[in-house]
């Protein structure tokens, strides 16, 4: 019995052993190896099928597998070496197309089992996607084919269409196309447009070579395949919708990239639609720097409720800023700064698949060093759990894969965080980090302060969508997810390997499987939905293995089957409910929580739901403020349009409040009692974000009760609202291109209105502010300065304000507190007080630099007076240079008058510092000029230094007796390639009367000649000089007529002409007698103003002789310097206060005048002195009495022909300022003043003219006689209508047209032709001055400039001796009388070039461009405005097999560098052939500057 028991026990043990062995064997995966000659251009699965396609582009062969890649065979029915590209249908999983380079192509309808040929007349175009498909299941067989037609050497792209997947005869649809796409081609782009709507980017003209001018490219649409219906999409901007670079459908947005043809800086514009009908412009914050430029922005992977765009803020940079839009893609906010990208436009950004709100990105931690001194990038990885609102570092795992502690502290995220390689360094096919496996994220990276190299990286896993991480294996591995994440597979990607590692329990434990041969892994893929247990491993085999086994090819595909590793299929008990976002990490996105059913970690089973994507479940949340947005659907597209159907229905955000942009329309039948207390139910201004599913909670979109008095009035009416401030106004300013205005009061409070003064709110009631600054280069940014280190800033036009800490309190040394950079809107310079507390003896000013808008500061220098960025809008200095006026001896108290050096520091003052000048009075930037006032210590005299690049300076040369070393001077504005300087000629100091000579420079700002003498200035250095806005070359001055008498008396009588800031002060003596002069040729000649014949009452003037003229008050008599004669929106119109007589009368004795033709003729419009303001581009002008308190204003809608009165107050108000939005395009005005009877306060009166008329003016450029505009040209007193040597025509509204202009795109001036040169195109040369006969004569005691033959070095055939005249720099006249040319002399050596030289010079640009262009066209597939989208055949940089990552929605602009490359080559070759010409081509002009700075009084006043 015992023996039996023993035997039975032995058999039992043996049985268990066999069972254990069989189980163990069952847990191992299986594999099969297939060989190929070349790596694949593409490998893809037909979605939800077992069929796989392998395309060998090198050999032109196509291979098909019907068993998930286990076995392969060549595609049946396709000839060998013929396939150029293979494209699968994105929706019909049976269809795919194999295109050749010819006209015969192939189609499969059974997932690659069989292929049938079809023919199209033209070969496929070399674009990323030559086929476009329809997303409607009923029309899946609709296909658009883009081909290239060649007629001789002329080639252009054409589009064909088929309604039966090419079983029918393809029909030609459109020629000269760039891209065609069905409007219904993306399932997320849901709209009710016509089912056959097609968009095409196409050209309406081509050159003889077949090329297309970008200006001819437009977006067309059709609903009948362009048979009879062909519509130009005007994008809401009419004729300006030209220059379309690309069109794409991204998520639920249709996007058009448009190049602004009116600019030369390559700026792009983005237009977006969500319904395929209405288009709106995408608006970005900090508009001047977040510009969309060619090859400088990428549309990244986007959600259905937000569009993501990464923008390069600096030219030639690979550092961007990520912006995310509102729900309709029109308004963008900054999400993440310093994003990493590469030259191809790929951005290190990816959303975690299937998990709302979670995304990963890489940022450049040392962006300043990278851009400043080209340092290597230090990348850091960031993650967001709330759709980009907040970003944080990736939490580092505490231990490595062996359980050892990592060598840093994970609680210190600055020094110890996880950083992962991303899109710019792809290491596998498909998505970088995630897959449809719920919540599983993997990556290759390093732990530390920043990302290490790929070779030093390890492999990490997160099972909770990136919240926590663990290291799963050392070294870099490729990875893939299978069976909904229940299988994880990794393979070494750094070295040769013969094994894989896999985990069946979400990375808890790992096993190894050896597949028998050594490979270098190049790809690991599975079914796109990650539901299969089969994987494909692509690799390169070693030569040794190929020699051992002759069946092995250079490339192998290893089929890995994990089906037998587990026997049981999971049941319901094997699953957990996994929530996509953890508690405390903003669980709700778009109004709901999200969860998936996911297999438990230790469940020993397979999911087995093949081809069934993991299903996300939603639980709705209660509504909060984050579920609503402001009703600004079209507001940002119509900034200043006053059309009732647009902006008046909209609301603006003011902090947490939602305020109407203006009076809103009321429902019919309400507000009929004319009772101011009557109320109605109106819009709250909020709406739930489209697609948001929240329920209950806050209901911000419900109607609210409002007073009828706030509703819109009847048409033809004017309305106003009044707001009382408790303190006088000391500062006010609009945000540029906005309806938001800030006001600072004497009590140091700041108030904001987001609707042009209609409503007001106080900002931060408990704070006191000493100033506010608007960002000079970013329209949406402003800064509120307190007396402490704390300051407030906004990046969204005051919709929200945030606090930041400065390095020290604002300075008390009269230096500007903040300076801004034109290159990067986050770059700031702060100048503050240091060691200035009571009792300190070394109080001084310090300047600090921030590259993150105040988040972190770096010391620039101590003991400074003025620090600024060297670069400016038109001054192309080094963007990283900072220039400072720095005290030479830095000790003790900083005092005024201390000796200042001018120091330039490279690398944002952290690199090499160089002293430009050892003793300076000040510096300033004017347009393209950097002007420095230097002090010569030996002679104690001033010297003017001018630079065009911030590096090279030249001394200003002045006529004798007019050197700045003996005179005070004021540098005036420059807009016409020349500097104007006022040189004070009086010797007696103020308050003695002041006047001087106006000098004008040549185009380099170095040689100055006399423009006009005796120009008036006041004791503060301000000059009666003003240029007309919008018409270059027109300027007005006031000259002192009685200088001889004043010079003898040396004084000025009390009283005078001004209003407190004018030319007069306190000393008894002769009063200045001022006369006005105007120039229409940039200061060459000056004339009196022609007086009107009669006054505003129809009476003749008392002064009627030839000595009578119109004289007007200028800059020195102006209370508000912003109240200029002219407006940028009303071309040719000027208003002024003055009188007709022999000289200018006091301000209180003056009347109000208008000119419509640039100052040639004038009319008196009203008696008494008035302030004025332009609105709606000049279609409305209002004037308000400026002599005494008033209760009404006057307005005209016909430029002064008729005037109407509007009463705005019951009590009289002393109006101190009248303002409109900066562009003068709004019909709402704002009056500031003080009210009689109220002491210590002030009042703001909002006057709304939007209901005067509802008809918008019609502009018809094609038929100018049948619209509301006329063509007008400023006229010289001659036959030709020329100004600056050219006849220029402008559109202006017909004077009595009863319509409003609104926000119609401004029509650029038309240059009809250049005129022949006449006397008015010339001015006096250096050392010459005009005599009484208007001739240029040599100043006694001086000599002419020597002759200059340097033009010969520029390739000219002749050089000319100098004359007393020089051509006005801004003139473009041709031929005619050339007063600037004396005797002609032939240049030496011009005819000596060999024939071969000229052949090279002529032929090389064309040959080189053709060569480069052909190579680029055939190889890159990006010679057009292509848009790389998921699933396209897009080569990702660094990808061995040429397959893109498949996740980037990349909208790449057209690269315009072919001509530049040819030019470089030509310059190089020509320099080798003729060094002399090459060297002479570089002149002095090195740089461009500031167009806002107006006056330099030995300090920068901008």
From Swiss-Prot:
Pfam name, any one:
Sortilin-Vps10
- Record's bilayer topology term: Single-pass type I membrane protein
InterPro entries referenced in this protein's UniProt entry, alphabetically? Sortilin_C (IPR031777), Sortilin_N (IPR031778), VPS10 (IPR006581), VPS10-sortilin (IPR050310), WD40/YVTN_repeat-like_dom_sf (IPR015943)
Q: Where are the BNR repeats?
A: 63-74, 106-116, 460-470, 502-511, 792-802, 1078-1087, 1153-1163, 1195-1204
Q: Signal peptide: which range, if any? A: 1-26
The entry's localization annotation reads: Golgi apparatus, trans-Golgi network membrane; Prevacuolar compartment membrane
Q: GO cellular component annotations, sorted alphabetically?
A: cytosol; Golgi apparatus; membrane
* Lumenal side of membrane: 27-1394
Say which family it is in: Belongs to the VPS10-related sortilin family.
Q: What is this protein called?
A: Vacuolar protein sorting/targeting protein 10
* Species of origin: Coprinopsis cinerea (strain Okayama-7 / 130 / ATCC MYA-4618 / FGSC 9003) (Inky cap fungus)
């Amino acid at each position: 019995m015992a023996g039996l028991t023993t035997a039975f026990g032995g058999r039992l043990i043996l049985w268990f052993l066999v069972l254990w062995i069989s189980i163990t064997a069952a847990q191992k995966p299986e594999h099969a190896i297939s060989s190929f000659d070349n790596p694949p251009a593409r490998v893809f699965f037909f979605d939800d099928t077992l069929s796989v396609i392998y395309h060998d582009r090198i050999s032109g062969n196509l291979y098909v597998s019907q068993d998930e890649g286990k076995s392969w065979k060549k595609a049946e029915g396709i000839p060998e070496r013929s396939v150029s590209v293979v494209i699968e249908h994105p929706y019909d999983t049976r269809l795919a197309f194999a295109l050749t380079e010819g006209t015969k192509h192939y189609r499969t309808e059974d997932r690659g089992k069989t292929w049938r040929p079809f023919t199209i007349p033209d070969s496929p175009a070399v674009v990323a996607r030559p086929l476009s498909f329809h997303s409607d299941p009923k029309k899946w067989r609709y296909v658009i084919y883009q081909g290239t037609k060649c007629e001789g050497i002329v080639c252009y792209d054409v589009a064909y269409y088929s309604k039966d997947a090419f079983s029918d005869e393809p029909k030609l649809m459109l020629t000269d196309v760039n891209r065609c796409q069905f409007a219904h081609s993306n399932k997320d782009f849901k709209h009710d447009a016509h089912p056959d709507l097609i968009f095409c980017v196409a050209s309406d003209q081509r050159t003889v070579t077949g090329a297309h001018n970008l200006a001819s490219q437009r977006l067309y649409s059709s609903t009948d395949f362009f048979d009879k219906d062909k519509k130009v999409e005007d994008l809401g901007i009419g004729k300006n919708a030209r220059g379309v670079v690309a069109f794409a459908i991204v998520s639920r947005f249709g996007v058009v990239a448009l190049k602004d043809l009116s600019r030369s800086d390559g700026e792009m514009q983005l237009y977006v639609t969500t319904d395929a009908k209405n288009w709106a412009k995408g608006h970005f914050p900090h508009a001047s720097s977040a510009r969309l430029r060619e090859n400088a922005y990428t549309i990244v992977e986007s959600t259905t409720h937000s569009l993501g765009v990464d923008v390069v803020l600096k030219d030639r940079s690979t550092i961007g800023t990520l912006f995310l839009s509102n729900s309709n893609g029109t308004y963008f906010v900054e999400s993440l700064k310093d994003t990493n990208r590469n030259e191809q436009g790929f951005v290190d950004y990816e959303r975690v698949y299937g998990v709302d709100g979670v995304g990963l990105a890489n940022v450049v931690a040392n962006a300043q060093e990278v851009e400043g001194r080209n340092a290597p990038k230090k990348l850091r990885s960031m993650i967001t759990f709330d759709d980009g609102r907040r970003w944080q570092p990736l939490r580092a795992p505490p231990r490595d894969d062996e359980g050892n502690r990592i060598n840093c502290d994970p609680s210190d995220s600055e020094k110890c965080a996880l950083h992962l390689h991303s899109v710019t360094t792809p290491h596998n096919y498909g998505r970088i980090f995630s897959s449809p496996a719920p919540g599983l994220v993997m990556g290759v990276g390093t732990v530390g302060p920043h990302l290490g190299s790929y070779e030093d990286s390890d492999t990490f896993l997160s099972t909770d969508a990136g919240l926590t991480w663990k290291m799963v294996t050392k070294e870099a591995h490729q990875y893939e997810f299978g069976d909904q994440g229940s299988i994880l597979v990794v393979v070494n990607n750094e070295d040769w390997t013969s094994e894989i590692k896999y985990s069946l329990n979400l990375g808890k434990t790992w096993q190894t499987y050896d597949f028998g041969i050594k490979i270098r892994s190049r790809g690991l893929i599975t079914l796109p939905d990650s539901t299969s247990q089969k994987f494909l491993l692509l690799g390169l085999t070693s030569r040794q293995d190929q020699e051992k086994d002759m069946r092995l090819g250079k490339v192998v595909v290893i089929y890995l089957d994990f089906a037998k590793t587990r026997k049981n299929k999971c049941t319901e008990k094997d699953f957990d409910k996994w929530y996509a976002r953890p508690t405390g990490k903003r669980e709700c996105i778009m109004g709901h929580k999200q969860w998936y059913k996911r297999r438990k970690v230790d469940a020993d089973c397979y999911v087995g739901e093949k081809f069934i994507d993991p299903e996300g479940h939603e639980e709705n949340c209660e509504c909060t403020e984050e579920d609503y947005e402001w009703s600004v659907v079209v507001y940002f597209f119509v900034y200043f349009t006053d059309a009732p159907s647009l902006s008046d229905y909209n609301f603006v955000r003011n902090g947490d409040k939602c305020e109407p942009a203006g009076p809103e329309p009321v429902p019919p039948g309400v507000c009929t009692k004319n009772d101011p207390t009557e109320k109605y139910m109106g819009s709250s201004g909020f709406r739930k974000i489209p697609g948001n599913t929240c329920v209950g909670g806050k209901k911000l979109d419900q109607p609210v009760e409002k007073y009828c008095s706030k509703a819109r009035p009847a048409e033809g009416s004017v309305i106003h609202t009044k707001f009382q401030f408790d303190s006088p106004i000391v500062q006010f300013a609009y945000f540029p291109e906005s309806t938001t205005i800030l006001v600072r009061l004497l009590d140091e409070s700041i108030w904001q209105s987001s609707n042009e003064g209609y409503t007001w709110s106080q900002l931060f009631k408990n704070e006191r502010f000493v100033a506010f600054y608007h960002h000079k280069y970013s329209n949406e940014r402003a800064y509120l300065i307190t007396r402490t280190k704390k300051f407030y800033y906004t990046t969204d036009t005051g919709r929200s304000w945030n606090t930041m800490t400065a390095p020290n309190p604002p300075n008390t040394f009269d230096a500007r507190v903040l300076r801004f950079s034109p290159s990067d809107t986050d770059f700031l310079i702060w100048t503050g007080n240091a060691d200035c507390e009571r009792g300190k003896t070394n109080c001084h000013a310090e300047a600090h630099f921030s590259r993150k808008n105040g988040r972190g500061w770096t010391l620039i220098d101590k003991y400074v007076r003025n620090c600024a960025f060297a670069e400016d809008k038109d001054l192309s200095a080094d963007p990283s240079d900072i220039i400072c006026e720095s005290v030479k001896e830095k000790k003790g108290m900083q005092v005024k008058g201390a000796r200042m050096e001018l120091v330039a520091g490279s690398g944002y003052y952290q690199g090499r510092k160089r002293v430009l000048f050892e003793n300076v009075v000040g510096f300033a930037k004017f347009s393209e000029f950097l002007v420095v006032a230097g002090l010569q210590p030996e002679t104690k005299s001033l010297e003017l230094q001018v630079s065009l690049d911030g590096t090279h300076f030249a001394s200003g040369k002045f006529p004798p007796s007019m050197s700045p070393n003996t005179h005070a001077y004021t540098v005036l504005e420059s807009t016409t390639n020349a500097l104007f300087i006022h040189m004070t000629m009086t010797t007696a100091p103020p308050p003695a009367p002041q006047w001087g000579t106006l000098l004008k420079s040549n185009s380099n700002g170095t040689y100055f000649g006399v423009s006009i003498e005796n120009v008036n200035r006041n004791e503060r250095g301000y000059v009666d000089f003003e240029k007309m806005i919008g018409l270059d070359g027109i300027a007005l001055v006031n000259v002192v007529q009685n200088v001889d008498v004043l010079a003898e008396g040396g004084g000025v009588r009390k009283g005078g002409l001004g209003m407190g800031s004018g030319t007069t002060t306190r000393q008894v003596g002769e009063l200045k007698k001022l006369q006005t002069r105007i120039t229409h040729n940039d200061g060459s000649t000056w004339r009196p103003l022609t007086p009107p014949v009669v006054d505003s009452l129809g009476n003749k003037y008392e002064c009627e002789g030839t000595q009578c003229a119109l004289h007007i008050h200028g800059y020195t008599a102006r209370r508000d310097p912003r109240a200029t004669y002219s407006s940028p929106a009303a071309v040719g119109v000027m208003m002024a206060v003055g009188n007709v007589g022999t000289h200018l009368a006091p301000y209180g004795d003056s009347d109000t005048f208008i000119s419509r033709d640039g100052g040639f003729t004038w009319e008196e419009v009203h008696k008494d002195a008035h302030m004025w303001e332009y609105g709606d581009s000049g279609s409305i002008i209002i004037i308000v009495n400026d002599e005494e308190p008033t209760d009404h204003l006057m307005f005209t809608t016909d430029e002064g022909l008729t005037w109407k009165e509007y009463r705005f107050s019951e009590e009289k108000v002393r109006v101190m300022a009248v303002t409109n939005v900066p562009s003068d395009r709004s019909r709402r005005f704002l009056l500031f003043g003080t009210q009689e009877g109220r002491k210590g306060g002030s009042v703001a009166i909002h006057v709304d003219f939007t209901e005067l008329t509802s008809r918008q003016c019609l502009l018809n450029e094609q038929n100018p006689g049948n619209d509301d505009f006329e063509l007008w040209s400023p006229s010289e007193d001659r036959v030709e209508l020329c100004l600056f040597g050219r006849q220029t025509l402008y559109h202006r509204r017909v004077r009595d047209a009863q319509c409003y202009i609104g926000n119609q795109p401004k029509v650029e001036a038309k240059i009809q032709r250049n005129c022949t040169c006449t006397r008015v195109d010339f001015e006096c040369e250096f050392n010459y001055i005009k005599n009484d006969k208007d001739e240029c004569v040599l100043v006694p005691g001086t000599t002419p400039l020597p002759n200059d033959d340097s033009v010969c070095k520029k390739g000219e055939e002749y050089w000319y001796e100098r004359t007393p005249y020089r051509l006005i720099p801004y003139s473009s006249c041709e031929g005619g009388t050339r007063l600037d040319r004396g005797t002609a002399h032939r240049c030496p050596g011009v005819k000596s070039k060999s024939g071969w030289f000229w052949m090279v010079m002529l032929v090389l640009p064309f040959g080189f461009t053709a060569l480069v262009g052909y190579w680029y066209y055939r190889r890159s597939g990006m010679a057009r405005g292509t848009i790389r989208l998921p699933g396209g055949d897009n080569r990702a940089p660094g990808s061995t097999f040429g397959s893109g990552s498949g996740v980037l929605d990349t909208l790449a602009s057209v690269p315009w560098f072919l001509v530049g490359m040819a030019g470089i080559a030509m310059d190089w070759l020509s320099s080798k052939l003729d060094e002399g010409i090459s060297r002479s081509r570089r002149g002095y002009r090195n740089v461009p500057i500031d167009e806002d700075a107006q006056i330099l009084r030995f300090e920068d006043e901008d």
